[in-house]
Amino acid sequence: MKLLNILNYKALGLSLLYLALILVTFQISMGSYGEDEPQAGSILMVAGLIFSIIGVFLLMKFKPTYILWEKLKR
């Protein structure tokens, strides 16, 4: 049960990082086409930054070395 919880946090963190990457890539492609809305691009950049910070915190919540160390102690 604990391993399933750890995998859920890791999957959620990775999916948020992928979402942030998609948002930032979309913002860069909007800027390269010379859109007239610079505010929309900055909103996408801030949303990507927030999602990436949350994803990194979720990924770092459970460290895989800690899990391996607990298994070795048993």
Curated annotation (Swiss-Prot):
Membrane topology: Multi-pass membrane protein
GO cellular component, one term: plasma membrane
Record field: transmembrane: 11-31, 40-60
Keywords, comma-separated and alphabetical: Cell inner membrane, Cell membrane, Membrane, Transmembrane, Transmembrane helix
Compartment annotation: Cell inner membrane
Family according to the record: Belongs to the PceB family.
Its biological purpose: May act as a membrane anchor for the tetrachloroethene reductive dehalogenase PceA.
Protein name, per record: Probable tetrachloroethene reductive dehalogenase membrane anchor protein
